[in-house]
């Protein structure tokens, strides 16, 4: 038996799981069953797309058995199986960047982080919450026929050996038949988890977490037989299918309840909370496809990581194709979880073909439009409810849903203004901003471009905004003084990407977007030109003195029209990057100390 050391990050993860995560131990079975389903999906795809697997008999099933006396719980699948390299890569290492940050997050969140294990793609390790030891028996489909045995108690190392015919597990799990492929996860339950070796506990958890797994799950158990007098007279082995095994997204919407949608979301997302909303679409006509999309209640932890994992699975006629294609939806919708199932794509479609496929491009285009339409609908509904003095409990839930949506997903949606030219006007109707008009109205008061335009002064020609990194500081900026006095509303933009996406968007309908921190944005303040000229002449000597004193530090010193109380302010030239942009670029190692010279207004 060869012994291997776990990767350092795996060791850290296992220590956290074993010693800190105990609040929701139930999810380990969900993760193991989900992995079994993935293994079946992979083999199903290969049997129809790869000649190497054409002779493999695909009999999809997941079998769960237990031994109450020995405290053993086993989950067996007839999926793709693993060879030695797979065992090392899948069960001995974590091949993702961001692992250290992920482990740090788990450390901080402690026992409340069990759901994140599956979301990061390492759900197998969650079984150590309930296990004193785990044995894995596996034979890879279309491989060399060997049965391998992986074993670990979760402390530092694992062992791999070839399983011989003399081994009890070899025959117990059917590996004596050459056509048996797939994997068995045998969990030796610790003393605190022995309740999981129970028919009723397993049945309850499968129905709760895995009912909508698309393959049949069978529970094996021993039932006591009783005579007519109620006395036990022996036992019999029983096997029951314990899940519905249907592709929920293919079912008619009228058949499904909210609970069905929520349960399926938890199955595919590894998230223990209900989703914020879902969008289920059946399209027929020149192309036939089904989509079921979810918006998570909490933003995915890797939403701002460069190697974020796609949350959308692609199927063709219910055959799983991939869950690792980030082109299925644009990156600004990377928080979406769900399923796309096409009736028209070829089953043997490759990743390269996917990127250029017109059918998939059409599905993507229509899906984006549908999602943006639903987001706008929710926002419009919330706006109506905010105007009401009394609302029902259901209306309150809708309002909270919208507030949560804005807090979590306003920022990534803004990216679409920059990257998605075809849908930027639709996105502009959804995104929200803080405003000088909502002073003291609470954290849930937001303004849309449409709201701003509705409140504009009759003679106002531009939409004004101020950008920076801190909302509180922006609200007290002297740059706002004259605009407030004039009664011009100013949008407060405190997201780090605002200075990139807003200038790129440039104009909402017929109204130009102008930053109050830029020279030339104060033309509408209505200063008397003759009066301004007199002041300019009077202050010229002072300006020259200040300019000389600040030589090399500022680009210019000018008389400002935008101040009413403060003696001076700093703005940037209309052709220069903003100060917020300068900070961002310096943080990325671009630009030196003299990157942008500001203009002093007095």
Predicted features, each with a name:
Residues 116, 134-177, 190-195, 200-602:
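GHKL/Bergerat-fold ATPase module in large chromosome/replication-associated machines
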Residues 1-191, 195-196, 457:
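GHKL (Bergerat-fold) ATPase N-terminal catalytic module, capturing the glycine-rich phosphate-binding loop
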């Amino acid at each position: 038996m060869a012994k291997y050391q776990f990767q350092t990050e795996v060791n850290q993860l296992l220590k956290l799981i074993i010693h800190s995560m105990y609040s929701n131990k139930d999810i380990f079975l969900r993760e193991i069953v989900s992995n079994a389903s993935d293994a079946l999906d992979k083999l199903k795809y290969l049997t129809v797309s790869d000649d190497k697997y054409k002779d493999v008999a695909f009999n999809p099933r997941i079998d769960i058995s237990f031994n109450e006396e020995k405290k053993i719980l086993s989950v067996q699948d007839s999926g793709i199986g693993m060879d030695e390299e797979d065992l090392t890569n899948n069960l001995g290492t974590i091949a993702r960047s961001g692992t250290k940050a992920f482990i740090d997050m788990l450390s901080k969140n402690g026992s409340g982080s069990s759901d994140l294990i599956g979301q990061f793609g390492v759900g197998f390790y969650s079984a150590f919450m309930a296990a004193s030891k785990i044995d894995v028996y596996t034979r890879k489909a279309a491989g060399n026929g060997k049965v391998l045995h992986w074993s670990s108690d979760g402390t530092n190392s694992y062992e791999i050996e070839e399983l011989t015919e003399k081994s009890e597990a070899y025959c117990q799990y059917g590996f004596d038949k050459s056509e048996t492929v797939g994997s068995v996860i045998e969990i030796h339950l610790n003393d605190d988890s022995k309740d999981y070796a129970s028919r009723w506990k397993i049945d309850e958890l499968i129905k709760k977490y895995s009912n909508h797994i698309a393959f049949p799950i069978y529970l094996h158990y021993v039932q006591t037989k009783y005579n007519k007098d109620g006395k036990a007279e022996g036992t019999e082995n029983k096997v029951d299918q314990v899940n519905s095994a249907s592709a929920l997204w293919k079912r008619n919407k009228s058949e499904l309840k909210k609970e069905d949608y929520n349960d399926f979301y938890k199955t595919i997302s590894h998230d223990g909370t209900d989703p914020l909303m879902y969008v289920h679409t059946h399209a027929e006509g020149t192309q036939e496809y089904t989509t079921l999309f979810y918006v998570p209640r909490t933003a995915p932890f890797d939403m701002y990581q460069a190697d974020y994992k796609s949350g959308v699975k692609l199927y063709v006629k219910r055959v799983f194709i991939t869950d690792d294609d980030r082109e299925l939806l644009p990156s600004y919708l990377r928080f979406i979880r769900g399923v796309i199932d096409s009736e028209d794509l070829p089953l043997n479609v490759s990743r390269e073909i996917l990127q250029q496929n017109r059918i998939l491009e059409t599905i993507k285009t229509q899906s984006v439009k549908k999602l943006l339409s639903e987001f706008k609908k929710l926002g419009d509904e919330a706006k109506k409810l905010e105007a009401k003095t009394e609302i029902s409990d259901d209306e309150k839930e809708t309002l909270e849903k919208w507030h949560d949506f804005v807090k979590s997903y306003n920022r990534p949606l803004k990216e679409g203004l920059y990257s998605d030219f075809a849908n930027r006007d639709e996105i502009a109707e959804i995104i929200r901003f803080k405003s000088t008009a909502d002073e003291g109205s609470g954290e849930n008061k937001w303004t849309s471009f449409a709201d701003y335009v509705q409140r504009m002064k009759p003679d106002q020609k531009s939409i004004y905004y101020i950008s920076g990194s801190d909302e509180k500081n922006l609200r007290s900026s002297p740059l706002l003084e004259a605009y407030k006095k004039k009664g011009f509303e100013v949008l407060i933009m405190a997201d780090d990407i605002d200075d990139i996406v807003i200038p790129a968007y440039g104009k909402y309908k017929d109204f130009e977007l102008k930053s109050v921190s830029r020279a030339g944005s104060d033309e509408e303040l209505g200063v008397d030109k003759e009066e301004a000229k007199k002041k300019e002449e009077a202050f010229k000597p002072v300006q020259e003195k200040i300019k000389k004193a600040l030589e090399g530090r500022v680009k210019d010193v000018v008389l400002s029209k935008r101040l009413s109380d403060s003696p001076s302010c700093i703005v940037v030239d209309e052709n220069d990057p903003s100060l917020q942009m300068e900070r961002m670029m310096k943080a990325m190692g671009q630009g030196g100390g003299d990157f942008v010279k500001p203009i002093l207004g007095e």
